[in-house]
């Protein structure tokens, strides 16, 4: 039987596979200093193994604004939303001339094939994470990781009702973090801003109180389930000396 790990931090695709995640490494160190056991799951590397480097490379190099990775994972993150696939790919090819011309039909078919594999990948990843019997799972969200992270956390929350989910990273800054939390109820906690100093106490509090932490007890920039009932704080500036004159 595997040994339970209270906290799993997940580095979702699509992100660089040449180096470990500095951000998650810092969080793991902070959790260790707080007396909490955690592990980092490099799901970006699992995805490379799942689809192969020939397909992973172009996804890693695709500009985030093209939303190609979002499109690939959207069917799992938002199962009720099914856009016209060929219309999206037409626009993508139009905006990305490198994919146009000879072989475009094959590239189109390959992207559709990759999209059909995402459900299996998310299930496989969820199996590997749940085997660790975590109490909470946190996903990073930088650049193209946002929708893949939403897809995984949704699947995990469906399969383990007691599991507490967290999200943080550059895509969760300010109003982006608040909007993510408000619109996606399967994400229990969103951390907006640097988490190094607060992650230890926050995770201890979550382990003790689960989803029932009152807004007043949460650190600045952290949104929890109780915010959905009590309301979200108004935007504020902590350091008035930094306000432009």
Go through each PLM region and give its residues.
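N-terminal pre-triad scaffold of radical SAM enzymes
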Residues: 10-13, 85
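Glycine-rich beta-alpha loop elements in corrinoid/cobalamin-binding modules
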Residues: 6, 14-17, 21-47, 103, ...
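Polynucleotide-recognition surfaces of large bacterial nucleic-acid defense/processing enzymes
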Residues: 236-238
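Generic start-of-chain signal for non-secretory N-termini
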Residues: 1-11
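Pyridoxal 5′-phosphate
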Residues: 245
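Conserved N-terminal ligand/cofactor-binding loop architecture of enzyme catalytic domains
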Residues: 39-123
